[in-house]
């Protein structure tokens, strides 16, 4: 530990725990028994190399202990419902507050979770529509209202005195039947007259009705002449009518009505039959007088798509329905029928499908060598959707028996639908699901709600329309709502609107103006999810809390970074301690206090290299971060490679999501950056359109591409690889060694050792996934899980293998004194040195070293790797493959979780891939990466509806000069201070 830092700590007084979080002896993961004091109520940034111990200190020590102490203070009953954190390996922590962690994990993969529900904006919207929304009739477009009996009486008494009226109970409205039994029942109850299909009759002399035709029947409850003293009688008559007609009553004018007051006309729903008198419908419920469309009581649950009371019955509130996609069933229309044109049948080895197609060919006059595109439309429809009543003769033979049958053909798509519904096999269901795609629900048009909810409007909009707006446009709309409401409604809505507007403002402040409120949470990136939770926390207004954040700037353009940092300062100014694990230069410079952890990664990290204000960090010669902040070290700009405009991949008229018929050319053999503000359309262009379209063409992938006309230039590449941040495995059994393929030669090496050969061990003996060499007590896991209910689940080291995963006999086979279990426990750096005599193993670990993953363990569970680490493991796997020089690599924000120094190493690797003739395209906001690109495509200019256009393209220098490019504005000063080697000019490159 630095002597200066120790002396500084000794000078601090005994009351420092009130002003600081004091940590003594932190040893979690790679932390080297460190002591540190973090000032309270400040914005504190933890920085350092990837794997140096930042998250171990911030999340696994400080947050874990703060959360553990809070949960421990609750009753045993409450604790069983909460996740208990293990006590971190630390001697003492003082000055802790209740801790809240805001990490990069996606909020929820549940399709019912949306931006609106996660931020609680939608909950307030439901309340707003329930309290001040006005229902409108789908038939007439007029407002429909419910009234109390008192309101009904008041409306009638407001008519001119002397007006003659009939008070009717509309018991039958447009329904077929004879109604003999009902007519007799009403007569028995004492009613005298009835109006049937527009004509009054004595009940005793009512005509016989034709049951084949619909009828309207109104029972006459009372005949009234409007006078001031009939209020009591009117109330009783209304109650009788409402009871008889299930909440409805009609007042019909016996003469032509006199003009009612203007306000009354507005409030009263009327119907006017050309051949009959004018009527006023009153309803205890909400009901349309023309169509009979009724709404139950308007309450918040009516607007919830997660509640059967409000969800669209057709799609169950999901807003989409699954349909078989014809393009997925027939991905390549150039293929012959017998060569796999019908994808679901192409993989099967069963003769059934060939025999079925042969029979169809005989019937419809085609052969198995006929290309799909050459079939007549009628034949294609019959193959896909069935032959209808047309019977076809089929002959089947399975090697045992043969038989003939004559029947209609159900069709490939019909067959997929039926099997998907009927199968109980999860595997079969997953296979069939590849041919489905989501389409907006036809019943609710994707709004998720039943018709009754969508007819309720605030102003002129129903709740579904506002959910489809971006955060920015929704904010503008909610500002105008008070103008559309009357005084009473504004009193009700005032507090609700305030809460909604505040939450929308917080989302704007963290750069999420482009998201729609209906956007599914599962489609958000880790950075977007984290910033949504950050906005929610500011909305909660808590004080005295410890917030721990993990790189909130991920996925955020430099333009929006200042607003994010203002948000963090606002959180601090509320009286909270904000600890941020961050590599962003602006965030480090803005911090009140910085901890630089290092000096290296993994076993070489875990020390406090420097601490203090940003200025003190920059003055500390030991701080690698400080050297990058001062400019002593930097990511250098390599010489640009000139584009060859004859070798490009061209996307023509991409129009998915917010893209506005974009045509983009990506030069091959270069390092290209796709840039632009968040929500500008980068992922839609690169992942949803380019990658999916090419992957379907080259790899027969099942996911459909976003709408576009065509992709040109595919002849120049032989494969496309999306190196994303999804986990390298879904189970703890998957690890870097198994994913990169290094574990197979390791097992083969151990199987080739003299001791293993003498015992007859094969490579399978050294696998922890199969019986033989693994410990059967824990089935190769090394630990046994014990559920503790109101305490955290305890993972006890297996008594039999002592956590080694293998049985004793397998562990007796040693190489250089190490067993297979010892190898799995090594870091990548240790393993590369250990296997330096085994080229196949050494080379794989060296590629992991080159992407900056020295510190991860060979057998580390895949589920414990961050998104950035998983992405770099995938990159290492690609690096270890034999290069063809014709691969297109796509990476989405590969600098996630990387320090300046790690970025430098990553860029060396990416440029090496390009040097081999490959093409690398990255979506990136990091200016240190953008400045090293050969070519840049900048999308925007804004996010959401304001984006979706190519603002600028060319070398970084051209982007810096583009007047409409936000990226260029921030890139220009970075390029000016960058060290520039001699390079070709753009004009030379063009030649």
Swiss-Prot record:
Chain ranges of the ABC transporter domain: 345-624, 644-972
CDD domains listed in its UniProt record: ABC_UvrA_I (cd03270), ABC_UvrA_II (cd03271)
Record keywords, A-Z: ATP-binding, Cytoplasm, DNA damage, DNA excision, DNA repair, DNA-binding, Excision nuclease, Metal-binding, Nucleotide-binding, Repeat, SOS response, Zinc, Zinc-finger
Localization terms from the record: Cytoplasm
Keyword check for DNA-binding: yes
A GO term from the CC aspect: cytoplasm
Zn-finger (C4-type) residues: 775-801
Binding positions (ATP): 48-55, 676-683
Keyword Mitochondrion: no
MF-aspect GO terms: ATP binding; ATP hydrolysis activity; DNA binding; excinuclease ABC activity; zinc ion binding
Biological process terms in GO annotation: nucleotide-excision repair; SOS response
Gene3D superfamilies: 3.30.190.20, ABC transporter ATPase domain-like (1.10.8.280), ABC transporter ATPase like domain (1.20.1580.10), P-loop containing nucleotide triphosphate hydrolases (3.40.50.300)
Family assignment from sequence similarity: Belongs to the ABC transporter superfamily. UvrA family.
Subunit structure: Forms a heterotetramer with UvrB during the search for lesions.
Function per UniProt: The UvrABC repair system catalyzes the recognition and processing of DNA lesions. UvrA is an ATPase and a DNA-binding protein. A damage recognition complex composed of 2 UvrA and 2 UvrB subunits scans DNA for abnormalities. When the presence of a lesion has been verified by UvrB, the UvrA molecules dissociate.
Record-given protein name: UvrABC system protein A
Origin species: Bradyrhizobium diazoefficiens (strain JCM 10833 / BCRC 13528 / IAM 13628 / NBRC 14792 / USDA 110)
Gene this chain is encoded by: uvrA
